[in-house]
UniProtKB/Swiss-Prot annotation:
It is a multi-pass membrane protein. InterPro entries: UPF0324_pro. This is UPF0324 membrane protein VV1_3166. Coiled coil: none annotated.
């Protein structure tokens, strides 16, 4: 490295601090890549995939399995339908607009489950490239930012009660951070409902990632045999959830691990941002954003309509 790469080192260290959010980290990496300040000799892709796996495992310690299942028993049906419906709709829309399959699937997974965390979990399972991950994350983050402001306004305009708004936010907003932000702005009960449902929704990272590995099994060797690459970190993610539930006396330790994992994920997003530039975005076109927006509008309107009809 030389002096030219000092901004990269500084930005990386900054992402280790609690002052940089995930969207900011992604933007920082993107800006450095666009200005040629990312060291070309670093195997960033390798570092990113390993750190992503470790981060997802650590996040498992922050999910209270039994509590999430118990509290969300009434809403589990809607969660399953919306997840399956979003993935299916994403497949169909991608075919119509001819969007590259892997990028479309990542955006669909992020929309269906829990935004950036779902994308981060599914990406290694389907061997997604950094550019594909970055495009999916960028799309989700843009829509997340809009949701943070739009959802409370719509909720008040329609006079939604606290539970209805909390349920809607948990289903229709991608990332947990934006769900919590929008729900807290609406009310305390909405916040409780939204947070619990969103955590239960996050549990679906496990089966979706495993299913993704099967669907995206690649051909291997000259004979063209199918090779299944199992995302073993998902099993460790599941083990982390189970362990923290079986041994609750170490809650303070789990919270520490969870906090470190969240910060590591911020670093991952910075590294992913370093893999994409203005030139690459231009070559991708507007299709990813159009695709993500289409899915988001459909899932938001249909879930809200169902909640209004059944309340």
């Amino acid at each position: 490295m030389n002096r030219k790469h000092l901004p990269f080192i500084f930005a990386l260290l900054l992402c280790l601090s609690p002052w940089v959010s995930s969207p900011t980290a992604l933007v920082l990496g993107f800006l450095l890549a666009s200005t040629g300040l990312v060291p070309s000799q670093l195997p960033i892709s390798t570092y990113t995939k390993k750190l992503l796996s470790y981060s997802i495992i650590g996040l498992g310690f922050g999910i209270q399995f039994q509590q999430a299942i118990a509290v969300t028993s009434d809403g589990i049906g809607l969660i399953v339908v919306t997840i399956a419906g979003t993935l299916l709709l994403g497949f169909l829309v991608a075919k119509v607009i001819k969007l590259e399959t892997t990028t479309a699937y990542l955006i669909s997974a992020g929309t269906a489950i829990c935004g950036g965390s779902a994308i981060a979990a599914v990406a290694p399972a389907i061997k997604a490239k950094d550019q594909q991950i970055a495009l999916a994350l960028a799309t989700v983050f843009v829509l997340n930012s809009l949701a943070l402001f739009i959802f409370p306004v719509i909720g008040h305009a329609l006079a939604l009660d606290q539970q209805t708004f909390g349920t809607w936010a948990a289903i229709a907003i991608h990332d947990t951070s934006s769900v919590v932000g929008a729900a807290s702005a609406y009310g305390e009960q909405a916040l409780t409902t939204a947070t619990t449902l969103k955590l239960a929704r996050a549990l679906w990272i496990i089966p979706v990632a495993l299913l993704s590995a099967i669907l995206f099994a690649r051909g291997n060797g000259e004979e063209g045999k199918r090779k299944l690459v199992l995302p073993y970190f998902i099993f460790w993610y599941c083990a982390a959830i189970a362990f923290s539930d079986l041994f609750p006396q170490f809650e303070s330790v789990y919270q520490g691990i969870f906090s470190v994992a969240k910060q590591a994920l911020v670093v991952c997003l910075f590294l992913i941002g370093c893999s994409i530039s203005v030139e690459k975005l231009k070559s991708a076109g507007a299709k990813p954003l159009i695709f993500g927006l289409s899915l988001w509008v459909v899932i938001s309107t249909t879930s809200l309509s169902w909640l209004l009809l059944t309340r």
